[in-house]
C-alpha cells in the first residue's frame, strides 16, 4: 500500500470512500426519492446488476492499496435494506484494516440490526431525521411514518455501543420552524446534530435556491437561544463546520454545500451499488468498475484505472452552481448516497 494519498488536479487527496449498497429505501423523502417518481413500477436494479459483497470488498481493498483510505461510509438508498449488510462490514474491516467505518441510515431498522453492526466493526451511525413533529415528518418521508421508529433506532444504536449523530435537511417553508426544537432536543440527548442545506442533488426534487435556508441563518436562530462557539475541524476536508454549545461538550454541525461550498477540500469518492465510481456528489456520470471486475481485469489494471480517474479530477460543482448548472442531468442521490 502506498503511504501517501493520490491527489487530483486541485491537490485534493483521495481520503474517504462512500459505498452505496442498495438503490432501494423504505422512505420516499421528497428531496431524495419522491413517491411520484419512485413508485411501485420504478425499475430498481436487479440483483445481477449490483456488486456482490466480494466484488465490493475487492475494489475497496485495491483502492486502499492504491491510496490509503481513512474513512468508509456505507450508504444507500437505505443501507439496512441490503440483506446481511453486516457481513460486508465484517469483510471490509478484516480485509482492509480500515477502522473508521460508519453508516448513514433512516434508523428504522436499527433495533434489529444495531448489535450485528457493532459486532461487524461499524463505529457509528448517522441517522436522518428532519422534524420532531410526527405529522410533518410523515409528510417529509412520504410514508406517514412518525418519529418513534427513528428515535428508537437511535437508542438501539447507542445501547449497542455505536456512536450516534443526527442529520437534518432544512428547507424553507417545510421544516425551518423545527431547527430550534431539534437543536434543543438533541442538545439534551447529547447527540451531535448536523443541519444540511437543501441541495440540488439528482433531478427529481424540484430544487430551487429560494428553498434553501442558509448556514448563517441556521446558526443565527440557534445562537440567539443557545450560544455557540466554533470548534476546530478534526481533519482537513471535514464536511461539517462544527460548533459547540457554550459550557457543554455537545456539538452541532452545518453542512453548507450551497452557500459556503467546501469543494476545495473535498476528498471523497462515491462507489454506487452497481459499481460506478463518482468523484462528485453532483456528477453527471460515473466510471464503470463492475465491467472491469467481471471481465477478469487484474488488480493492477483496476488500480491504474482508479489512479487515472483521480489524477484528472477537477470537480467543483458547488463553487460554480447557478440556475443553469442545476438543469444539467445528475445522478440521483438515492443511487450514490448523500
Swiss-Prot record:
Function in brief: Catalyzes the cyclization of GTP to (8S)-3',8-cyclo-7,8-dihydroguanosine 5'-triphosphate.
Major enzyme class: lyase
Subunit structure as annotated in this protein's UniProt entry: Monomer and homodimer.
Annotated residues for binding of GTP: 18, 73, 104, 165, 268-270
Residues engaged in binding S-adenosyl-L-methionine: 31, 77, 128, 199
UniProt lineage: Bacteria, Bacillati, Bacillota, Bacilli, Bacillales
Pfam families in the cross-refs: Fer4_12 (PF13353), Mob_synth_C (PF06463), Radical_SAM (PF04055)
Cofactor requirement: [4Fe-4S] cluster
Catalyses which reaction(s): GTP + AH2 + S-adenosyl-L-methionine = (8S)-3',8-cyclo-7,8-dihydroguanosine 5'-triphosphate + 5'-deoxyadenosine + L-methionine + A + H(+)
SMART domains in alphabetical order: Elp3
One annotated GO biological process: Mo-molybdopterin cofactor biosynthetic process
GO MF annotation list: 4 iron, 4 sulfur cluster binding; cyclic pyranopterin monophosphate synthase activity; GTP 3',8'-cyclase activity; GTP binding; metal ion binding; S-adenosyl-L-methionine binding
PANTHER family assigned: MOLYBDENUM COFACTOR BIOSYNTHESIS PROTEIN 1, MOLYBDOPTERIN COFACTOR SYNTHESIS PROTEIN A
Name of the molecule in the record: GTP 3',8-cyclase
Amino acid at each position: 500500500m502506498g503511504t501517501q494519498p493520490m491527489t487530483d488536479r486541485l491537490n485534493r487527496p483521495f481520503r474517504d470512500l462512500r459505498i452505496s449498497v442498495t438503490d432501494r429505501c423504505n422512505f420516499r423523502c421528497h428531496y431524495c426519492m419522491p413517491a411520484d417518481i419512485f413508485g411501485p413500477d420504478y425499475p430498481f436494479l436487479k440483483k445481477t446488476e449490483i456488486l456482490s459483497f466480494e466484488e465490493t470488498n475487492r475494489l475497496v481493498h485495491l483502492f486502499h492499496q492504491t491510496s490509503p483510505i481513512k474513512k468508509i461510509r456505507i450508504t444507500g438508498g437505505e443501507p439496512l435494506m441490503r440483506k446481511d449488510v453486516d457481513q460486508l462490514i465484517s469483510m471490509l474491516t478484516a480485509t482492509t484494516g480500515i477502522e473508521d467505518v460508519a453508516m448513514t441510515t433512516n434508523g428504522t431498522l436499527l433495533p434489529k440490526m444495531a448489535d450485528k453492526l457493532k459486532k461487524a466493526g461499524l463505529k457509528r451511525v448517522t441517522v436522518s431525521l428532519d422534524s420532531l413533529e410526527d405529522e410533518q415528518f410523515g409528510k417529509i418521508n412520504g410514508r406517514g411514518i412518525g418519529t418513534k421508529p427513528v428515535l428508537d433506532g437511535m437508542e438501539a444504536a447507542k445501547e449497542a455501543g455505536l456512536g450516534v449523530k443526527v442529520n437534518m435537511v432544512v428547507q424553507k417553508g417545510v421544516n425551518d420552524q423545527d431547527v430550534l426544537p431539534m437543536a434543543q432536543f438533541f442538545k439534551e440527548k447529547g447527540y451531535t446534530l448536523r443541519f444540511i442545506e437543501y441541495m440540488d442533488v439528482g433531478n427529481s426534487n424540484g430544487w430551487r435556491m429560494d428553498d434553501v435556508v442558509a448556514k448563517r441563518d441556521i446558526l443565527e436562530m440557534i445562537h440567539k437561544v443557545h450560544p455557540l462557539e466554533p470548534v476546530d475541524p478534526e481533519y482537513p476536508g471535514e464536511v461539517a463546520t462544527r460548533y459547540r454549545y457554550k459550557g457543554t461538550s455537545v456539538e452541532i454541525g452545518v453542512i453548507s454545500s450551497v452557500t459556503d461550498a467546501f469543494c476545495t477540500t473535498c476528498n471523497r469518492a462515491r462507489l454506487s451499488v452497481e459499481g460506478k465510481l463518482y468523484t462528485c456528489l453532483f456528477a453527471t456520470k460515473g466510471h464503470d468498475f463492475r465491467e472491469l471486475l467481471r471481465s477478469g481485469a487484474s488488480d493492477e489494471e483496476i488500480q491504474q484505472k482508479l489512479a487515472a480517474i483521480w489524477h484528472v479530477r477537477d470537480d467543483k460543482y458547488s463553487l460554480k452552481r447557478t440556475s443553469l448548472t442545476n438543469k444539467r442531468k445528475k445522478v440521483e442521490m438515492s443511487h450514490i448516497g448523500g
